[in-house]
Amino acid sequence: MNIASVIVDIPTQALDTPYSYAVPDEMLVGEGGRPAAVGCAVLVTLGGRKAVGYIVGLEEVVPSPDEGADLWGTPQSAADLKQVEAVLSAPFFDEEGAACALWLAERYAAPLSECARLFTPPRAVPRIVRGRDGRWRVEEPAIGEVDDRWVTRGPAFDAFVPRKNAVKQQEVLAAVGAGDVRVAELSREFGAVGSTLKALGAKGAVTVERRRRMRGMEDGASRAGAPAGGPAAPAPTAAPQLTEGQQAAVAAIEAARAAGDGRVVLVDGVTGSGKTEVYLQAIERTLAEGRRAIVLVPEISLTPQTVARFRGRFGDAVAVMHSRMSDGERYDQWDFIKSGAAKVVVGARSALFTPAANVGLIVIDEEHEGSYKQDSSPRYRARDVAEWMMARAGGALVLGSATPSIEALYQVNKNPRWTAAALPERANGRPMPAIEVVDMAAEFASGSRAMFSGRLARALGEELAQGRKAVLLLNQRGFAKFLLCRDCGFVPECPHCSTSLTYHEQGAKLVCHHCGYTVAAPPTCPECGSPYLKKFGAGTQRVETELRQLLDGLPGVGPTVPIIRMDADTTQAKGAHQELLESFAAADAAVLLGTQMIAKGLDFDDVTLVGVINADTQLHLPDYRAGERTFQLIEQVAGRAGRAELDGRVMVQTYEADDVAIRAAATYNRGMFLRAELPKRKLLGYPPYVRMANVLLWGADEHAVATEAELLHAQLAELIRNEVGERWQVLPAVPCVLAKLRNTYRYHIVVKAPLGDDLSAPLVRLFRARKVNPAVNAAVDIDPVDLL
């Protein structure tokens, strides 16, 4: 008998293990449909209802006459096993993907079905729905392949001569003679061509055939897998000569790959040091051995420039995956990867779960970025998943950053499986730009109330007047524009979240950036009726307005210098990100104004000035990483200046000029920052000296959430005390910093454990055994990146 181990697609901790189902022999060979295999979606029955499941194990079992055993060693009568009722899809993943899904569930205390779903393309899995008659039925996937009709030369193309008055036939034949062409393109050019193609087809002059269309190619999302006659990637370029530091970094990666046991190499290189070229050459060596590579880039840095570097080297062998692509585009790229034609996958963190077989190298660029941690279940950290994958596959993991996370630096120091390759200088030999700290408190004391200091204004005038470019960063994290009544102190807040509403100049409206709640800005204070509602803070729209006024008054600059604003509003439309960068590149002198999305991943030779308008706002967040993130942001954005032959300079405006994070970043002195930061982390018990878990609870009834939080805290404290004693800390249940979000109240419990301890196992056991309160949601975040 053949038995399948199936993860049932119902997201609950109660389904904490795969279930065993008998597989009819005809399903194994695919009689009448697809064969059953690991990774397939299947139809099963669980508890009287139909459900979709994923096969994660398949084994032939010979039971004794009275009793058999399932894959997990549980004695079970073979006659009691339910059968797999239908195979609903081809395999989405292989045995390694199945093993990873099971590991993710244990590591991150997540429902098995949510972990398995990571490996499926968006909206490509059949669903089970219940009809009005009460019967369950399978609803086909919403996403699948799409075809285009193409016209090619027929067997009689050369011999056929159309009549002189058959103008449309002549036009169509001329177009086809230049190469295969889509019917849709012929229709756009010549109008309705259906009857013309039918007539030409009857004569054997042309052939009309269906070909799969790879969505997204026409707008540059990825041209990989383009059909004949479609747009092709540029021819691969040759690798440049490496610097000594780059050669040493590539050698370190090669040594890690040769070890074949999942070693980690941290490429610790300043901005402009050529880290990307190191990745490219390490990938070339990996591909030469017949293996594949995955490159992770933060979503915010996944710019057309970044993709072009990889496609310029590897051409049509590059697949791209990111959230700005449509579901159809991602489905096509997923399928392209599964076909084996894609040798390199470039994408955000979810690219880890694409069906790329035989991966020998994973690169995580900007490894310090918080976006590599998923903020919904399963709350995985991409670095840890990639390290697990490479240990299993006998490959190597490469982490790259100009400002590595403190945890990565600690691992290099303490873990013999981790090594570092330093690139302390820029690849072109140019110096790092000088950073000047502008004390805005002193500016204010001298009577200045302007958003731009005198020194930054003068620097803008000097650089722009010479036809050069500037980048201005508005650090909006923890700093947004709001209204405040100067009479009573009232600040309009979101009725659904415990945050102030952000004021938007365009449309004079107040918006909650957590839940999207929007309301017109009141003309007077809703609390006391005062007309003195003052705008505090500065959004990018207001900064753009004041910057325009400043530039218009600068000698030699004036209104002809464009300001290109990049933020969440201006980059919403598809392709807007690329269009804005192209506009900036094409201008003679221009200012790129934006939020953190401009701090990294941009490489323009003629940017000579970088200004940070408000460097210290992140320091005031109740987050133990606040200083680290401020240090990283300043060094990252500073690296946008002076990347080519022209010298660069950086102006950092701050009200906290004496803060060690800002002073250290301004002098590129990581050691200064670490000497101040690490003792605080050790004293207070924060990473890298401990591991943490954040147990989250949320619900619509605040009293119910608080009560459940106290109960769960007591259960946790007892479990930890009994299993590990006093070495772990279970902090009291308290409201989150963001105590209310989208009409739900939020509490959390922080658990701290020594390094090396299995933090997940006790929490997984508790969560799978506890009685669920239907009024309160609960989840575990293992190794959280923040506690907000």
What is each model feature region?
Residues M1-S401, A408-L409, N413-R430, L464-A465, ...:
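Accessory, non-ATPase domains that flank or precede helicase/AAA+ motor cores in DNA-metabolism machines
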Residues Y21, V437-V438, M451-L456, L712, ...:
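Short intrinsically disordered coil segments
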Residues A233-T243, Q247-A251, D261-A706, E718, ...:
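Inter-lobe coupling/hinge segments of SF2-like helicase ATPases
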Residues R670, A706-L731:
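Short amphipathic alpha-helix segments
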Residues Q729-V737, D783:
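Solvent-exposed beta-strand/loop surfaces of large extracellular or lumenal domains
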Residues R742-T744:
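C-terminal effector/interaction modules appended to NTPase cores
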